From Swiss-Prot:
Subunit structure: Part of the small subunit (SSU) processome, composed of more than 70 proteins and the RNA chaperone small nucleolar RNA (snoRNA) U3. Interacts with MYC; the interaction is required for localization of MYC to the nucleolus.
Task of the protein: Ribosome biogenesis factor; required for recruitment of Myc to nucleoli. Involved in nucleolar processing of pre-18S ribosomal RNA. Required for optimal pre-ribosomal RNA transcription by RNA polymerase I. Part of the small subunit (SSU) processome, first precursor of the small eukaryotic ribosomal subunit.
First and last residues of every HEAT repeat: 920-956
Protein name, UniProt field: HEAT repeat-containing protein 1
Keywords: Nucleus, Phosphoprotein, Ribonucleoprotein, Ribosome biogenesis, rRNA processing, Transcription, Transcription regulation
Gene expressing this chain: HEATR1
Domain of life, per lineage: Eukaryota
Subcellular location, record wording: Nucleus, Nucleolus
Organism, as annotated: Macaca fascicularis (Crab-eating macaque)
InterPro entries on file: ARM-like, ARM-type_fold, BP28_C_dom, HEAT_Utp10/HEAT1, UTP10
Family membership: Belongs to the HEATR1/UTP10 family.
Annotated GO biological process: maturation of SSU-rRNA from tricistronic rRNA transcript (SSU-rRNA, 5.8S rRNA, LSU-rRNA); neural precursor cell proliferation; positive regulation of transcription by RNA polymerase I; protein localization to nucleolus; ribosomal small subunit biogenesis; rRNA metabolic process
Amino acid sequence: QKKSQDLESVQEVGGSYWQRVTLILELLQHKKKLKSPQILVPTLFNLLSRCLEPLPQEQGNMEYTKQLILSCLLNICQKLSPDGGKIPKDVLDEEKFNVELIVQCVRLSEMAQTHHHALLLLGTVAGIFPDKVLHNIMSIFTFMGANVMRLDDTYSFQVINKTVKMVIPALIQSDSGDSIEVSRNVEEIVVKIISVFVDALPHVPEHRRLPILVQLVDTLGAEKFLWVLLILLFEQYVTKTVLAAAYGEKDAILEADTEFWFSVCCEFSVQHQIQSLMNILQYLLKLPEEKEETISKAVSNKSESQEEMLQIFNVETHTSKQLRHFKFLSVSFMSQLLSSNNFLKKVVESGGPEILKGLEERLLETVLGYINAVAQSMERNADKLTVKFWRALLSKAYDLLDKVNALLPTETFIPVIRGLVGNRLPSVRRKALDLLNNKLQQNISWKKTIVTRFLKLVPDLLAIVQRKKKEGEEEQAINRQTALYTLKLLCKNFGAENPDPFVPVLSTAVKLIAPERKEEKNVLGSALLCVAEVTSTLQALAVPQLPSLMPSLLTTMKNTSELVSSEVYLLSALAALQKVVETLPHFISPYLEGILSQVIHLEKITSEVGSASSQANIRLTSLKKTLATTLAPRVLLPAIRKTYKQIEKNWKNHMGPFMSILQEHIGVMKKEELTSHQSQLTAFFLEALDFRAQHSENDLEEVGRTENCIIDCLVAMVVKLSEVTFRPLFFKLFDWAKTEDAPKDRLLTFYNLADCIAEKLKGLFTLFAGHLVKPFADTLNQVNISKTDEAFFDSENDPEKCCLLLQFILNCLYKIFLFDTQHFISKERAEALMMPLVDQLENRLGGEEKFQERVTKQLIPCIAQFSVAMADDSLWKPLNYQILLKTRDASPKVRFAALITVLALAEKLKENYIVLLPESIPFLAELMEDECEEVEHQCQKTIQQLETVLGEPLRSYF
């Protein structure tokens, strides 16, 4: 009390009074036992207030006095509240404690020592009268940012720490969570405080930067405010650092800054870091897409999310470019942080990824939500210049997702994915499935426990496939498709060892492809691929599904317009069918006719619309091969016979694919199988070979192409037969063609077949060809219009058919002569064939063009080869003479043809022709003066060529 009166009695004038005050204050400072020291408080503030008023020069420096007053106030506070808590009102009234004066002390004084005293006092008062300090908090920190933080001495550093430690908890405690307004208010003040620190950072001595920021965030609470610091650091880089950086230095500066940011983050726990990343992502989501939006929002009282949003990065005060740079930098930093050594080391030190349980799922979810938002922005800006930025940002966001994914051990990954697969956002579910698919495609040997966990996902995936969520149609289709793909991968990886969980998968996929479901095409395609995989894995376990699967699959394949319009769908259907046939060949006989019909029909269609090298055609070829090579003849042949009856009704372009299956099947039949099924096959071929006769009025070329498919197939069987087994077949076919009441068209078929067999059997065919000599000779005469006027075929296209018949006979004879090594052409056979063949030189059947073509391509090579096969000069002479006689024909075309035949004969017989030369010269001499210039010219050429062939000059004979 006495002291209080002493202090008050000091007069305002004169330096001696201040000296007394100083003395008393010094005494007070050392006085340990003071009763009711609170009585001094108003007096001390009164003195402090006087100290701050401008004083006459002679009063000297009052800084020491200020420091003493502040020190006394600090002592009183510490005495009244040893624990730093609030003081009851009846002890010391808040109103008497003038915080504003202390703040003024800080601001007006130029002396660091005074600042320190004032700040220490404020720190203590913050605990006792928090509200009083809060009103002045920004002044305190602004001052610190501008002054104290720039000093590089330990004492200043301690003052900063002390102030932060004392003032900020008071601020945080004032947010008791009573009202949103108070909380928001406190948050905004905190943002401003952090902002002061970040702004001061470039001026803070480098080695002090990290400790100051760490102390600040530690005191504020890293879980709540680390993210705010990071955002302000990014903002500082985007708005200030980049502008200040010299050209070419930006990368180095960014690298250094990023390293510093890593250091800041890694001072805090992994959990707090991950929480901060989530907060940053959520904050980025609230930012507008573009700067322009905020202008309109400002006019319309801002949108709700803007309103609720904590103002850290003020969009209105930044450019669009800065906003974009800020977003990109934020995502880029997060991605780098998660793969940085500092962070990974921290994870290991904290006890490995297990400590993240629960957090990483939320982080994944947040990242996926962010990716979804960026993807939508990219779509919205597809036609704007900024699309490049959105694409880059999306790529960075996916990069971030990969980093999050890489952090998860598989044990944690599976439950996290399981949680995300059930997420309410379709896009999150889809991305979760993608992550799972990526994991399943890694070539890893999984532990049994992990496989079990993977298999537990099957019911969750089936729920998506069965559309047990009420979401948008399109969204669901893509998710269901992805889930089917995931099931396929699971089955591929684990199904062989663990088939049971996949039985319901097959059953679900089979239900999806039922025609009455009318499923979306892409879902159907994925379901079919899933069927393919699961069937081949389950094998016998898939058999119970066949009665449901096969009819649906065959109905799907009947819908050719749908299939052809989508190659993926078509390939999926073929894959499913291929796997069923490969895996369960013994169980598909009830469906074999349907399978054959559909495969044949599809090949016809795909070959019409696409190239032979298309994926669909390759897949079809493979499927036909599987059908032909895996099924037993007892199963396949009856189905072939029944299917043929269907094919024949609609034969155009179907016969080739159909016969190719049988041809390949015959190719792989064992000898004993062929023997036991030969009669069945013979009966089938006799029926099939009647094709031409049954379609005698159709286009000859088309019929010919189709018949060749049947013949190729039959020849495939013939080459596998022995002479003993082929002979009866040959006679059967011969009788089939030659019986009295047989249609003439059968001869076309038979001679075509004989030609093809002659080509395949080569010299062996001469064992059977003897029976053909007379029929060939007779037919050659019957279709020679220089000998008969009668039509051979009773149809409008008789000449075309006769030309074709001639072609087959001449080709077949040529091959018999060419491959003959057994002296097949005896004198009798030579005589039987000689005139019918030579007379063909006069047969102008089919018109001039056809005649010339036939003579050049078939007749002349055949006669020339005939002469070689005779190998007898006694037979050459009559042959040569008969040909020479034709050079006297009334028609110049015939004379011309005969002349070329003479030359062909000479070219084949070479020096042996010399014996025939004397006989030939008179005929050639006549032709040298032929009335037809063309013939005369050809004769001269022929003589020249004969000279070359025989190696003798012939000019002297003419």
